[in-house]
Amino acid sequence: MEYIQNVVEYYDELYPVTDTQKKFYANIKKSYSMPVKFLQIGCGTGALEHALAQDGSDVTGLEVSKELIAAASLRKRTQLTAVRFFQLSTLDMTRFLGKGFYNVISCLNSRIIFIHDRILLKKFFFDSKVLLSKDGTLVLALFNFHHTEQAAVTQLPELSSIRVKMISSLKKNGTELMYLNQNIETGNGKILKVMDNEEVYPLTKEEIVAFGKDAGYTKFCFYNSFSMDEYTNNSDMLICMMK
């Protein structure tokens, strides 16, 4: 079960747009002519989307949470950039969005793991390929699930700011899926639940390559952060760029 309303106020603090992220995407933009067309899946409150649009890039953000899409839409009213937000599931992307239109599609902050069905995950890779322009790039950022292979319960890296911290854990549930539990602890010690045994799919590097190849992707690059440091199975995070 999800309690997204408990995280909206703190979302930008827990998932800040960093200079490293900006540099990462600035390098990607060099491969395409302006305006670069971005599709951001699981855009949250839209902070990164507005940062991407500062140079005139065309940015579309998708979000399934009504609370987060409301926050993103409110941000749009105060900033004059070429950004649009839609409350839309990945299941419906190809029905409503332009095929072959986007230069870069991103799904960050482990949002892809909430597609907790192998068939629907494969569909995600096929659909993203359909929406990408020729030589377009798909960017994924998620927890490195090689950390979960041995333990029944795995603690994820803590996210924190001055006001709040998020504590997350993954628990095996006896199937191919796992349970994600997340709590927020505020500065005064109050505990707010965000995820309670929410089912997620432990997507690995090997499956990303397999699903990607099936969908027509041929080039895969893996890093352990947006700094583009070399990925290893011991990395906390997995960043993938594929074409």
Predicted regions and their residues:
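A short SAM/SAH-binding and catalytic strip from SAM-dependent methyltransferases
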Residues: N103-I119
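Conserved class I S-adenosyl-L-methionine
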Residues: M1-G44
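Class I SAM-dependent methyltransferase SAM/SAH-binding core
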Residues: A47-M93
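A short glycine-rich, Lys/Arg-flanked "PGG" loop and its adjoining helix->strand segment in the class I
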Residues: K122-K134
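A short acidic, Gly/Pro-enriched loop at the edge of an enzyme's catalytic core
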Residues: R95-I105
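C-terminal lobe and adjacent flexible extensions of AdoMet/dcAdoMet transferase-like proteins
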Residues: K205-K243
